[in-house]
């Protein structure tokens, strides 16, 4: 198994090559989009945008693929860097495949992207899609339940809980027996409302996993929450405004639960308002209240008493026009990286006052304002181009529900995949993680895991060679076959599985039906049927069978010939063997007609009117079987023969023998007649 450096070879249906190519999230965080190609199937994993870019620049490198060739598209969760380009891809490209996500993801996807459209600080011409495109894309998205197994065009897949955010899923994908697990963003730590990512029950051959935090180790949840609430309390008690930039859905709900509980425990803070500032605030919370059953046991137990998402100390704020900035307060505003929208407006309004503070509570992508302020520059540039001093405090506490090094390593150890492909991580963090994992598993003799960290548009090529086996079914399976014996049937391939069936069983086990093609050939012929029999018998002794009742010949057991009005009509069922026999018969007849075989004398001798043949035949029969074996007088072409009380008849026109009483007698008569016939022909 190797890692390719180029893309010269592309996997097809019969190839053993599995190709994994990041079109986004390759040594970067943002615009997650991973392409899988194996056994002729093409699958896209996520279709996001880059938060630090805008317009077409924010898209994955989808110009390197043909959208109409993609069979399946899986969306892991509703964050913009994983689904932000989906409406554009579904509505503005030639994609004709099927798109899957969980129910909660689909419900939140609509509102998240609606908010993104409204707050995007770019011109209409640069917008990737409109509200109408977003609405239309909903009809093209199918939903899947957790642990529900699906089979589409031979690709089997199942969704598993990923933690991270509500509805986030890992996808286990199986193609031709090879299993690939795509984690998306996941967290192995349970928080206040979400379950931890589960470990799928089967081992994948390939694990495609995020590497956002590289080798970092997260602080304990309790310590993180205490540090967060202490910072918020410090800012508001000194008379400042506390800004917490978040995305409308995801970590926002976790932080709201923490703040509401902390305010309840501290009566001295009750006069200080907390605002959840998002145009989608009410809609978002309605979605969370709907999908309570997708959350952890703590929330499900609490809902029996009261809904934890009906907050006592938090108010919704639709926009800055509805906000009276008259004193200390806490505002959670979107978007999380402050590229535009309400969080950007509030930051620019408050950044000059040292009493105020901003708490960055999630991962920040390079090129965003949130990432820039973490380095605490002396001044910032507003959206209008104005320079403002940065006097407010800046703190970073990671509530981002991504795995740290310990969680990632433990997850790999539990699954024991053969290959691990790292995506969704900055180049340096990803490289450090790869080296750390290699060192850890090199020392473990019980595992042999290979690690990869491809850049965007660079493919990882893996080869999986397996034996192809066919399952014998139907009437073929009912036969008692010995070891080493040969079986003949129709090999049926379906969903990368092979079955061997008798042709008659096709309709029972498949959607196919069997058809028979009968070939018919007409050839000019100037002689009789008996002459034709004599001619064809020269191809091979015993290859000609006379069907007296139908006045036709059967050659090689598969080709039937009749002579009608100086035309030979030849019929056979088309198979590769029968066609060869038919060619031989046709060549023999054509050679005779063209003068290559002299049978004119034979034609005269075999006519029923020829008295010499009759006389010779009667004399021969009497010498062989006795004088009384044939009557002294008879009429027509049928000569009756009686031997030891058993009756037979010889057709003097076709030379066919009929004897129902004794097959041995029939064969003896046939030999006598044929030898006499050949002797008379040879004498001419």
From Swiss-Prot:
Zn(2+) 2 binds at residues 81-82, 185, 424. SMART domains: Beta-Casp, CPSF73-100_C, Lactamase_B. It is an enzyme of class 3 (hydrolase). GO terms for biological process: co-transcriptional mRNA 3'-end processing, cleavage and polyadenylation pathway; mRNA 3'-end processing by stem-loop binding and cleavage. Zn(2+) 1 binds at residues 77, 79, 164, 185. It comes from the Eukaryota. It is found in: Nucleus. Signal peptide: none annotated. InterPro entries: Beta_Casp, CPSF73-100_C, MBL, Metallo-B-lactamas, RibonucZ/Hydroxyglut_hydro, RMMBL. Its main location: nucleus. One of its GO terms (cellular component) is mRNA cleavage and polyadenylation specificity factor complex. Binds 2 Zn(2+) ions per subunit. Keywords: Endonuclease, Hydrolase, Metal-binding, mRNA processing, Nuclease, Nucleus, RNA-binding, Zinc. Its cofactor is Zn(2+). One of its GO terms (molecular function) is metal ion binding. Its EC number is 3.1.27.-. The active site is at residue 402. Component of the cleavage and polyadenylation specificity factor (CPSF) complex that plays a key role in pre-mRNA 3'-end formation, recognizing the AAUAAA signal sequence and interacting with poly(A) polymerase and other factors to bring about cleavage and poly(A) addition. Has endonuclease activity and functions as an mRNA 3'-end-processing endonuclease. Required for the cotranscriptional processing of 3'-ends of polyadenylated and histone pre-mRNA. Belongs to the metallo-beta-lactamase superfamily. RNA-metabolizing metallo-beta-lactamase-like family. CPSF3 subfamily. Component of the cleavage and polyadenylation specificity factor (CPSF) complex, composed of at least Clp, Cpsf73, Cpsf100 and Cpsf160. Interacts with Sym and Cpsf100 forming a core cleavage factor required for both polyadenylated and histone mRNA processing. Interacts with Slbp and Lsm11. This is Cleavage and polyadenylation specificity factor 73. It comes from Drosophila melanogaster (Fruit fly).
């Amino acid at each position: 198994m190797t890692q390719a450096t180029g893309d010269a070879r592309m996997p097809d249906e019969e190839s053993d090559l599995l190709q994994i190519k990041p079109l986004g999230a390759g040594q970067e965080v943002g615009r997650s989009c991973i392409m899988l190609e194996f056994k002729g199937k093409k699958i896209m994993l996520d279709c996001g945008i880059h938060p630090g870019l805008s317009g077409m620049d924010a898209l994955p490198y989808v110009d390197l693929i043909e959208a109409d060739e993609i069979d399946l598209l899986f969306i892991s969760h509703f964050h913009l860097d994983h689904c932000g380009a989906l409406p554009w891809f579904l509505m503005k490209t030639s994609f004709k495949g099927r798109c899957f996500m969980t129910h909660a993801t689909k419900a939140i996807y609509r509102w998240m992207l609606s908010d993104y459209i409204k707050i995007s600080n770019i011109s209409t011409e640069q917008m990737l899609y409109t509200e109408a495109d977003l609405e239309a894309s909903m009809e093209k998205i199918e939903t899947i339940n957790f642990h529900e197994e699906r089979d589409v065009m031979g690709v089997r897949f199942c969704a598993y809980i990923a933690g991270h955010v509500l509805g986030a899923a890992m996808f286990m994908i199986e193609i031709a027996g090879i299993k690939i697990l795509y984690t998306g963003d996941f967290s192995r730590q349970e928080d206040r409302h979400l379950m931890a990512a589960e470990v799928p029950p089967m081992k994948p051959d390939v694990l495609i996993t995020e590497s956002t935090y590289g080798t970092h180790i997260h602080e304990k949840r309790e310590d993180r929450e205490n540090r967060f609430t202490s910072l918020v309390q410090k800012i508001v008690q000194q008379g400042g405004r506390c800004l917490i930039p978040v995305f409308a859905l995801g970590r926002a709900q976790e932080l709201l639960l923490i703040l509401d509980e902390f305010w309840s425990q501290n009566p001295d803070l009750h006069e200080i308002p907390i605002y959840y500032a998002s145009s989608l605030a009410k809609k978002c919370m309605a979605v969370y209240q709907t999908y309570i059953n997708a959350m952890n046991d703590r929330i499900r137990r609490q809902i029996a008493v009261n809904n934890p998402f009906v907050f006592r100390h938090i108010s919704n704020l639709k926009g800055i026009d509805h906000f009276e900035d008259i004193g200390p307060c806490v505002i959670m505003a979107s978007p999380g990286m402050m590229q535009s929208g309400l969080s950007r407006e509030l930051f620019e309004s408050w950044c000059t006052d040292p009493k105020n503070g901003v708490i960055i509570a999630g991962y920040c992508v390079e090129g965003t304002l949130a990432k820039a302020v973490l380095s605490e520059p002396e001044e910032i540039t507003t959206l209008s181009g104005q320079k403002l001093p940065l006097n407010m405090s800046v703190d970073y506490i990671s509530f981002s529900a991504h795995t740290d090094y310990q969680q990632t390593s433990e997850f790999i150890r539990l699954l024991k995949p053969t290959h691990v492909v790292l995506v969704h991580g900055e180049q340096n963090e990803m490289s450090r993680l790869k080296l750390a994992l290699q060192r850890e598993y090199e020392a473990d003799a019980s595992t042999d895991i290979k690690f990869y960290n491809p850049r965007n548009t660079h493919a990882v090529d893996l080869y999986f060679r397996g034996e192809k086996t066919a399952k014998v079914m139907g009437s073929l399976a009912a036969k008692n076959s010995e070891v080493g014996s040969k079986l003949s049937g129709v090999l049926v391939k379906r969903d990368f599985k092979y079955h061997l069936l008798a042709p008659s069983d096709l309709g029972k086990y498949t959607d196919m039906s069997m058809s028979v093609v009968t070939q018919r050939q007409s050839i000019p012929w100037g002689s009789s049927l008996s002459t034709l029999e004599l001619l064809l018998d020269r191809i091979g002794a015993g290859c000609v069978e006379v069907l007296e009742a139908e006045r036709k010949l059967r050659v090689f057991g598969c080709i039937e010939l009749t002579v009608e009005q100086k035309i030979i009509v030849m019929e056979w069922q088309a198979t590769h063997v029968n066609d060869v026999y038919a060619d031989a018969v046709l060549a023999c007849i054509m050679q005779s007609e063209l003068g290559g075989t002299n049978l004119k004398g034979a034609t005269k001798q075999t006519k029923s009117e020829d008295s010499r043949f009759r006389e010779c035949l009667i004399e021969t029969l009497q010498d062989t079987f006795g004088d009384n074996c044939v009557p002294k007088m008879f009429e027509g072409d049928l000569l009756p023969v009686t031997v030891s009380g058993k009756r037979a008849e010889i057709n003097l026109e076709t030379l066919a023998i009929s004897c129902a009483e004794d097959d041995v007698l029939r064969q003896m008569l046939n030999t006598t007649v044929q030898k006499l016939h050949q002797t008379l022909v040879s004498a001419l």
